[in-house]
């Protein structure tokens, strides 16, 4: 199954970019601490979702969360990404005993190459802040509703915090300096807007987990079907 929707940023992930992406989250103390906080939120989200046994990690990127997902001994992990280079990098970079637990799958979040109700949970970290168009988010959420039997765990940037306010100010200054529209592939989304999109797609919000409340833009949502 091939996706009819192509986003410009997704085309950049060749082998070199995939390797850079893997190394990025290990570069410096601040990034390592940020990763630890990401892991804390991910563990809590998985617990709230009932420690699902069959998880689709989409997009899996360079497998950053595979060791965490593999902490549950009997969990089956499908590591999926639109980029073949990302999957290859993940399989080469992550510990062999972890990779042995993962079923690789090259597929798009816009058209997931899996049957209906085929996984317990979809684990979607660091994708939705790249999706600026509501129609595109709705397509992904429709696929998540189709493929997941029970839950979705996803992260994105939301408004209502200091970092979002500061980013908006910086973007206003940049746009004032140039008459051309700069390409943008990261978006701060109004929480009210995305939460309505979740409900419209047939999900209820079980929990909201903020990276740093009132300061950071990152938020993890735990969504349940029905």
Could you tell me what each predicted segment is?
Residues 1-49:
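Conserved class I S-adenosyl-L-methionine
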Residues 59-61:
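Class I SAM-dependent methyltransferase "Motif I" SAM/SAH-binding loop
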Residues 64-110:
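Class I SAM-dependent methyltransferase SAM/SAH-binding core
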Residues 111-116:
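Short conserved loop adjoining the S-adenosyl-L-methionine
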Residues 149-157:
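Conserved beta-strand signature within the Rossmann-like core of class I S-adenosyl-L-methionine
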Residues 158-200, 206-209:
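C-terminal alpha-helical "lid/dimerization" subdomain adjacent to the S-adenosyl-L-methionine
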């Amino acid at each position: 199954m091939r996706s009819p929707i192509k986003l410009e940023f997704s085309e950049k992930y060749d082998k070199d970019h995939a390797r850079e992406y893997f190394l990025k989250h290990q570069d410096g103390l601040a990034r390592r601490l940020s990763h630890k906080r990401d892991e804390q939120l991910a563990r809590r989200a998985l617990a709230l979702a009932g420690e699902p046994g069959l998880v689709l990690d989409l997009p899996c990127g360079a497998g950053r969360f595979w060791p965490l997902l593999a902490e549950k001994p009997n969990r089956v992990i499908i590591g999926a990404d639109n980029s073949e280079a990302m999957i290859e990098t993940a399989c080469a970079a992550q510990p062999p005993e972890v990779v042995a637990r993962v079923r690789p799958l090259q597929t798009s979040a816009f058209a997931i190459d899996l049957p209906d109700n085929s996984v317990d949970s979809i684990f979607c970290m660091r994708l939705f802040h790249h999706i600026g168009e509501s129609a595109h988010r709705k397509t992904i959420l429709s696929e998540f509703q189709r493929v997941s039997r029970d839950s979705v765990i996803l992260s994105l940037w939301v408004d209502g915090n200091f970092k979002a306010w500061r980013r908006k100010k910086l973007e206003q200054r940049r746009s004032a300096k140039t008459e051309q529209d700069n390409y943008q592939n990261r978006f701060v989304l109004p929480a009210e807007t995305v939460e309505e999109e979740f409900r419209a797609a047939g999900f209820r919000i079980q929990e909201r987990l903020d990276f740093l409340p009132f300061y950071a833009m990152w938020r993890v949502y735990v969504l349940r079907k029905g």
